[in-house]
């Protein structure tokens, strides 16, 4: 029986990588073709008879595989010609990929669920006032409102970077997918980015001709974001200051956004019933977020001596506290809709909060079934942020 020895060539150019850069297993590439029934004969460089074949493996193939090999060789040559003929496209794609990857890393770094929360506050408060005063709408106003988001997002981004820089060891246990832990971004780059972000927010705040009060609030917010994570102050290591800062950030941001909204629209700052309701509701919700954010971090916090309410109560008890307080918040909201129909739109108040309460009960049950593991606990925390966004959406129409 006629046999042919076919070896896999290994040139300086690694063709199987060029043809498929994501192929982690070269044995599956075109250059490692093996007939399903063909045995592989191991050989060393010393024993191999040809000086041109550099691999240690060669395949003993029957003549009936000749057509497959020829077809394979043509495919390799065609792929090689295509690769060699498009160096500029590779360069362009490489630059574009790096930019996209850096943007994605920054997005992960600034905690997407918090960014969405900041945007929901601004859009909810601004949207309600504009909804009730449609005659004030203008594209110039919308453009100004868009730029007003920059200081808010800058403050959040700065605080997130500081927190992750000084929590790298803890996050290796609690959140190994974060950019600084996984190595997607270096600590040096994170520091440079934090300075750029803080200065950008300050410049935009001044350029918007904001009142001195708002400039002071922004500067204080940057200081609070720094003091929250950076030793020796590190407010987050003390349960009371950790709790107080978290609540203050939510309530203070709502107050600041409402004040900026009324100022931009030329409206007086009035404590209307709806605004009083959302401030009270978000004060309670800020408490639940302050508690819930530590449930998934219990293991890492306990290992590094960070004392939180969650580490003292445990994941199960902490989850019931969070869910219980939030359910009470929803029941009070439903009661307000029933008692004061002349002030609030009762149908929206009752129905929306009943639906959100049901969703909360369902998610609490799902976490219990998952035995309060770290990953499901983190998903539960992000679900509470979904409830946060939803409340500001409901606020527009109550």
UniProtKB/Swiss-Prot annotation:
UniProt xrefs under Pfam families: UbiA
Keywords annotated in UniProt: Chloroplast, Membrane, Plastid, Transferase, Transit peptide, Transmembrane, Transmembrane helix
Catalytic reaction annotation: olivetolate + (2E)-geranyl diphosphate = cannabigerolate + diphosphate
UniProt record, GO biological process: cannabinoid biosynthetic process; terpenoid biosynthetic process
Entry membrane topology: Multi-pass membrane protein
Tissues where this protein is expressed: Expressed in young expanding leaves.
Pathway: Secondary metabolite biosynthesis; terpenoid biosynthesis
Subcellular localization(s) per the UniProt record: Plastid, Chloroplast membrane
Cofactors, names only: Mg(2+)
Major subcellular location class: plastid
GO molecular function, one term: transferase activity, transferring alkyl or aryl (other than methyl) groups
pH dependence, entry free text: Optimum pH is 7.
Similarity comment: Belongs to the UbiA prenyltransferase family.
Annotated protein name in UniProt: Geranylpyrophosphate:olivetolate geranyltransferase, chloroplastic
Species annotation: Cannabis sativa (Hemp)
Lineage: Eukaryota, Viridiplantae, Streptophyta, Embryophyta, Tracheophyta
């Amino acid at each position: 029986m006629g046999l042919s020895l076919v070896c896999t060539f290994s040139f300086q150019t690694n063709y199987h990588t060029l043809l498929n850069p994501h192929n982690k297993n070269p044995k599956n590439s075109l250059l490692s073709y093996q007939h399903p029934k063909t045995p592989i004969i191991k050989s060393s460089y010393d024993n191999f008879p040809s000086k041109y074949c550099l691999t240690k493996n060669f395949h003993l193939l029957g003549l009936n595989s000749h057509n497959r090999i020829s077809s394979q060789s043509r495919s390799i040559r065609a792929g090689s010609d295509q690769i060699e003929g498009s160096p500029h496209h590779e360069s362009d794609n490489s630059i574009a990929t790096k930019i996209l990857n850096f943007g994605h890393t920054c997005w992960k770094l600034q905690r997407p669920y918090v960014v969405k929360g900041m945007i929901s506050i601004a859009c909810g408060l601004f949207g309600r006032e504009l909804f009730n005063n449609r005659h004030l709408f203008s594209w110039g106003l919308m453009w100004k409102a868009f730029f007003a988001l920059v200081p808010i997002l800058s403050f959040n981004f700065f605080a997130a970077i500081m927190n992750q820089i000084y929590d790298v060891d803890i996050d290796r246990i609690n959140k190994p997918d974060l950019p600084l832990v996984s190595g997607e971004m270096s600590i040096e780059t994170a520091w440079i980015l934090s300075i750029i972000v803080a200065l950008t927010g300050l410049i935009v705040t001044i350029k918007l001709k904001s009142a001195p009060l708002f400039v002071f609030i922004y500067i204080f917010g940057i200081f609070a974001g720094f003091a929250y994570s950076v030793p020796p102050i590190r407010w987050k290591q003390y349960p009371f200051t950790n709790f107080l800062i978290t609540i203050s950030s939510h309530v203070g941001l709502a107050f600041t956004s409402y004040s900026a909204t009324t100022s931009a629209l030329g409206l007086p700052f009035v404590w209307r019933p709806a605004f009083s309701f959302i401030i009270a509701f978000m004060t309670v919700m800020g408490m639940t977020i302050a508690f819930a954010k530590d449930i998934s971090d219990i293991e890492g916090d306990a290992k590094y001596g960070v004392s939180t309410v969650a580490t003292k109560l445990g994941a199960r008890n902490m989850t019931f506290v969070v869910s219980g307080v939030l359910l009470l918040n929803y029941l009070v909201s439903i009661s307000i809709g029933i008692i004061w129909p002349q002030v609030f739109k009762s149908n929206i108040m009752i129905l929306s909060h009943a639906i959100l309460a049901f969703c909360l009960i369902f998610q609490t049950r799902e976490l219990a079934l998952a035995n309060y593991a770290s990953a499901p606990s983190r998903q539960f925390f992000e679900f509470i942020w979904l409830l946060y966004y939803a409340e500001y959406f409901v606020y527009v129409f109550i």
